[in-house]
Amino acid sequence: FLFQPQRF
């Protein structure tokens, strides 16, 4: 997600 840089 947008708030998860590790997954994006």
Swiss-Prot record:
Region forming the signal peptide: none
Domain of life of the organism encoding this protein: Eukaryota
Residue numbers bearing the Phenylalanine amide modification: 8
Keyword Transcription (UniProt): no
Protein keywords: Amidation, Neuropeptide, Secreted
One GO term (biological process): neuropeptide signaling pathway
Cell location: Secreted
Broad class of where this protein is predominantly found: secreted
One cellular-component annotation, GO: extracellular region
Function recorded in the entry: Modulates the action of morphine.
Protein name, as recorded: Morphine-modulating neuropeptide B
Species per Swiss-Prot/TrEMBL record: Bos taurus (Bovine)
Upper classification of the organism: Eukaryota, Metazoa, Chordata, Craniata, Vertebrata
